[in-house]
């Protein structure tokens, strides 16, 4: 997403989050679907600028305000640089992700929809080559007016029509006789390549600039499009030359600035926020009716549900303003970041505490469980903060893809590590069921822990793995099903967890150990932690249970 300045956000942010969180929030903000990318000393051969799903009458505007190449203009051969616009089956699949690193996308032909913008620094022109069947994909120089009479459709398409000799071959374009051709589609040659268009290239102070816009004219051209920049001279190892680039990208659909897959997200997040709010209110009503069996962990579960609801509410509002204005409200965006961070921390803390049996079965965590909390929770908080920072940066940044993959791996590691307290509790109950006289109670608790273990496993698979596979295979306009699956799985996990561990007298998980059993657990915990000296055992009766 785009980078924009945030003015005055530091004063309005809560002080308890500390300077590091403020720094991460201030590193970059989202300005919606109006992207501005500035790279200095860049050496990559391929830069993935953006991916967007277009409907009919959707428009893409690109303004290359600065391109300064490392090669000197005195060289005989002009550098091979330019843009490529490719339609792909899924937004998560890049057009050149599996290609040879030494192959230049600007030199290849394609039977699928592909548009190349070849920058010729010698002749100061940009050659536009179109491949595939493109009946109504309109390309014109310049940017669209701010308030067109018809959204997405330009009044005319200024292009240069090449000469065609009697043999049927295409000759060089004649700039002197070029004229607008209106909104008529281009004629396709015998070779399958459309006739070339030529755009002007500006040259000022050893830098180049030009702008163009693309309009999706029919349903046949709808789809997910990837816009990339290529510097083919840097594809050869050891011959990289640094270059500077500043580009502005503005994408729009007839209904707003959101991509095709993001248009339903405003309503989706609003509905899911209401569902989590209703679940939280229902959970609090259960806690108020069963005060005798309520523990602190129950109120922590309620706080998690309400925080999730507020986070989705702010997320929904952000998408609404992005769709209508092209950028979110800065204050609401920061509130979404804060609630998103709180939600991620509370989620893993709650899962780990329930799995370890804290407050339900025991009141002291062992050294192993403390290490899990000391490692997993800070990593998960860091991963959530890092995801927020990545969302506020441009996709074309040099470290964007690498950090996104690393952070996804860290999140999976955290999800796997958080299962250890549940496994340890299951093993403890298995050992206890054969050593003490409370076999029935321990077996009931063991069955409940096994169910919870399966629930956590399913939650991780549905929200981390299956959801990503779904996004990779569904059509571009249905990719919002990824968010639906994630939020639906989260809601189902919350409801099942509340049902399994609700405050009820007949819940085996809430049957605190009495005398002998509790003494054995406290003795084991104190032995593992090394704080046994100076402690005396106190008997607990049913009347001594914690009341909230």
Curated annotation (Swiss-Prot):
Give the species this sequence originates from: Bos taurus (Bovine)
Principal location class: Golgi
Sequence segments annotated as region (Disordered): 165-190
Recorded superkingdom: Eukaryota
Protein family (similarity comment): Belongs to the LU7TM family.
Signal sequence residues: 1-32
The annotated topology with respect to the bilayer is:
Multi-pass membrane protein
| Function comment | May play a role in intracellular immune modulation by activating NF-kappaB response and attenuating Toll-like-receptor response.
Name the gene for this chain: GPR108
Compartment(s) of residence: Golgi apparatus, cis-Golgi network membrane; Golgi apparatus, trans-Golgi network membrane; Golgi apparatus membrane
Protein name as catalogued: Protein GPR108
One GO CC annotation: Golgi membrane
Membrane-crossing ranges are 268-288, 297-317, 341-361, 372-392, 406-426, 454-474, 478-498
Q: Which GO terms describe its biological process?
A: negative regulation of toll-like receptor signaling pathway; regulation of immune response
Highest lineage ranks of the organism?
Eukaryota, Metazoa, Chordata, Craniata, Vertebrata
């Amino acid at each position: 997403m785009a980078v924009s300045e945030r003015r005055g956000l530091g004063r309005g942010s809560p002080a308890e989050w500390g300077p590091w969180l403020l720094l991460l929030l201030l590193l970059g903000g989202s300005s919606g679907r109006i992207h501005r990318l500035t790279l200095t000393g860049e050496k990559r051969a391929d830069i993935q600028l953006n991916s967007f799903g277009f409907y009919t009458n959707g428009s893409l505007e690109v303004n290359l305000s600065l391109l300064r190449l490392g090669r000197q203009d005195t060289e005989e051969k002009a550098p091979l640089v330019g843009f490529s616009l490719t339609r792909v089956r899924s937004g998560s699949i890049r057009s050149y992700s599996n290609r040879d690193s030494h192959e230049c996308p600007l030199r290849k032909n394609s039977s699928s929809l592909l548009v190349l913008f070849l920058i010729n620094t010698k002749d100061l022109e940009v050659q536009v080559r179109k491949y595939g069947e493109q009946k109504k994909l309109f390309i014109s120089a310049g940017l669209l007016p701010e308030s067109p009479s018809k959204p997405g459709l330009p009044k005319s398409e200024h292009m240069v029509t090449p000469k065609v000799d009697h043999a049927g071959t295409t000759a060089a374009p004649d700039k002197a006789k070029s004229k607008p051709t209106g909104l008529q589609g281009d004629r396709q040659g015998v070779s399958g390549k459309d006739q070339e268009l030529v755009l002007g290239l500006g040259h000022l102070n050893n830098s180049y600039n030009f702008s163009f816009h693309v309009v999706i004219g029919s349903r046949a051209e709808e789809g997910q499009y990837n816009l990339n920049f290529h510097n083919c001279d840097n594809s050869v190892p050891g011959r990289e030359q640094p270059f500077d680039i500043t580009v502005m990208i503005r994408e729009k659909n007839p209904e707003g600035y959101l991509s095709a897959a993001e248009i339903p997200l405003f309503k989706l997040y609003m509905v899911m926020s209401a569902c989590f709010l209703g679940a939280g209110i229902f959970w609090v009503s259960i806690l108020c009716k069963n005060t005798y069996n309520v523990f602190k962990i129950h109120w922590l579960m309620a706080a998690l549900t309400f925080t999730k609801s507020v986070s989705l509410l702010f997320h929904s509002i952000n998408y609404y303003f992005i769709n209508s204005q092209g950028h979110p409200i800065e204050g609401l965006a920061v509130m979404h970041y804060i609630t998103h961070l709180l939600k991620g921390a509370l989620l893993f803390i709650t899962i780990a505490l329930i799995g370890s049996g804290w407050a339900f079965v025991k009141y002291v965590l062992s050294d192993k469980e403390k290490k899990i909390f000391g490692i997993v929770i800070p990593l998960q908080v860091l991963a959530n903060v890092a995801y927020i920072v990545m969302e506020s940066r441009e996709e074309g940044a040099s470290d964007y893809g690498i950090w996104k993959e690393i952070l996804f791996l860290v999140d999976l590691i955290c999800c796997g590590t958080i299962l250890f307290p549940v496994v340890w509790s299951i093993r403890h109950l298995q050992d206890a069921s054969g050593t003490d006289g409370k076999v029935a109670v321990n077996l009931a608790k063991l069955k409940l822990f096994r169910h919870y273990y399966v629930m956590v496993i399913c939650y991780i698979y549905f929200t981390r793995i299956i959801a990503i596979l779904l996004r990779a295979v569904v059509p571009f306009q249905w990719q919002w099903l990824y968010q639906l699956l994630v939020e639906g799985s989260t809601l189902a996990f919350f409801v099942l967890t509340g049902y399994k561990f609700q405050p009820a007298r007949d819940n085996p998980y809430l049957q605190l150990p009495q005398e002998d059993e509790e003494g054995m657990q406290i003795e084991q915990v104190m032995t593992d932690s090394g704080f046994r000296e100076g402690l005396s055992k106190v008997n607990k009766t049913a009347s001594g249970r914690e009341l909230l």
